[in-house]
Amino acid sequence: MQPPIAKKIPTERKSTYYQTVDDYAWLEDRTKSEPEVLDYLKAENAYMESVMAPTKELQEELYQEMRARIKEDDQEVPYRLGSYWYYRRTETDKQYPVYCRRKDKDDAPEEVLLDMNALAEGKKFISLGDYEVSDDGNWLAFTTDTLGFRQYDLHIKNLVTGETQDRIATRVDSVTWDSDNATLYYTQEDEVTKRTNLFFRIKRDGTDETLVYNEEDELYNIQCHKTRSGSYIVLVIESSTTTELHYKRVGLAGEFRVLFPRLEGREYMLDHRGEEFFIRINDAGKNFRVVSVVAEKPVLEEAQEKIAYRETVMIEDIDCFQDFFVVTERERGLIRYQVCSYSGERHSIEFQESVYSTSAGDNYEFATKLFRYHYESFITPDSTYDYDIETRTSTLLKQLPVLGGYTPKEYETVRVFAKASDDTEVPISLVYKRGALEGEP
């Protein structure tokens, strides 16, 4: 069987920054109903099936082998938000997860917020995008894609009655609640280019929709969120090299304010605590530094430096809590967490292995002494920890079980460096059976 060849229909594309000819623009059928496009996609699928046909048995064998090592009936570590513990669980032979919560009290019954398997009934596919609970815990804003084109519809569920108002907005990329529990903000992508460029305010019943912002520069996308403190709604406008942030106090009327004027090449992000914004910014160099400014009168020239710029350390993220903040850094290719007090003291979370991967976990609570993170390595399965900033200890909450007789102690992992021709040290991560190198010079 010969592979299908897409025909060429030259189409001129113009923008502020470029002009080009796209021979395959005709394939951008957003209605999913153009017969010629559908015929071509069917031909591509048929060709794939034909080429892969000899491997059918091997595909099934590999699938069953990998499935045998996965615990299908499982539950994630719950995280606290307000007066509830939220979690996601999976069930054997079910394709999609179930999202649940329990009240923060003994013997509280489980509340199912979203059963993705039930939502998928009658559909070939479903994907959950954003998932935001209102401050009072009574409303859930969530987005779903049922076609596989990553175009999400916004729905609102009443968590008291269980009723859902479907599709109050379309092509939604991000969503966040205002503090009145009745107003939402969301960003929307363009139907053709898929660039996220529109920012709306809307009531939870789908009424009173207002366009707040339209980003006209085609190089930029936008996204909205609320700070962990719950005090500010932030609109992030960014290209691959430049950031601009707009912000507004929750619950207050008025326009969004620009944090710093847009400047080509300047990137930054913010979090909030008290009267200050804590900002990760690259004004001193590509590796970023951390500064703070007065939230209601942010002037970069008057910023207080919290973490200085360093040539060998990349600052990747900052998370503010009520009594501490965490700076995520990368040095020599490895992530570490600097736990910082607002008085200036700081220390790192220690890891035992020399080769590992780590990422911040579900840290939604602002008033907490715990920092959650995920950790894994070549020999350590994905593990969830809570780090106590007072005792400086990490508590293992869950480790992903690996079925099939895997024993981590039978293996070793190390990290070595090799020098390139320009004397640059290149990290090399090794994993091997314990004892395999014994007797070697």
Q: Which residues fall in each region the model found?
A:
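Peripheral, non-catalytic segments that deliver or gate enzyme domains
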Residues: 19-57, 61-84, 88-112, 117-441
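Charged, compositionally biased N-terminal leader segments and the immediate start
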Residues: 1-18
